[in-house]
């Protein structure tokens, strides 16, 4: 299944705020659809399956990943020792495109993915053009020398609501470099999500 490329505010009206998808807020007060409920009237889906599906969709749309990619991360999280839900989130947060977003290089994860795809981002002084690249503790993320995207990134850092990166990252404003200090803590996540419901959604696969 390919990534969603349709109206972003339509998705946030249905699922709530998704900081990785868009920073914009919809002025409409109803959910999408001809007979959409007001946003304050509760969720449209009331079955247990529907609630789990909605949480899964939040994860997919926020990080801009396909169904196959998400299932791959689920399997990898199950394989590792620890709390599966937290490991899943840490895998997604350690993606290079997510880290570029968290450092303030871009206003959305999709925009950060473009920076990576076009070869503007370096990890430990090497150009990495794979958005799903899994960063490791100690990795240094920066901008390629003489990259035309540097001015865009500098402008993004000034214009988007970026004050400081999450605690597992440090950022050098002079060098425009970030360092991965640790795995993310659950409390740092901006996304309103119940990851346990996502794990339950895939429990029979």
UniProtKB/Swiss-Prot annotation:
Keywords: Chloroplast, Plastid, Ribonucleoprotein, Ribosomal protein, RNA-binding, rRNA-binding. InterPro entries: Ribosomal_uS4 (IPR022801), Ribosomal_uS4_bac-type (IPR005709), Ribosomal_uS4_CS (IPR018079), Ribosomal_uS4_N (IPR001912), S4_RNA-bd (IPR002942), S4_RNA-bd_sf (IPR036986). GO terms for molecular function: rRNA binding; structural constituent of ribosome. Residues 15-44 are annotated as: Disordered. One of its GO terms (cellular component) is chloroplast. Transmembrane segments: none annotated. It is found in: Plastid, Chloroplast. It holds the Pfam family S4. Its main location: plastid. Gene3D superfamilies: Ribosomal Protein S4 Delta 41, Chain A, domain 1, RNA-binding S4 domain. Residues 94-158 form the S4 RNA-binding domain. One of its GO terms (biological process) is translation. Part of the 30S ribosomal subunit. Contacts protein S5. The interaction surface between S4 and S5 is involved in control of translational fidelity. Belongs to the universal ribosomal protein uS4 family. PANTHER family: 30S 40S RIBOSOMAL PROTEIN, SMALL RIBOSOMAL SUBUNIT PROTEIN US4M. One of the primary rRNA binding proteins, it binds directly to 16S rRNA where it nucleates assembly of the body of the 30S subunit. With S5 and S12 plays an important role in translational accuracy. This is Small ribosomal subunit protein uS4c. It comes from Thalassiosira pseudonana (Marine diatom). The lineage of its organism: Eukaryota, Sar, Stramenopiles, Ochrophyta, Bacillariophyta. The gene is rps4.
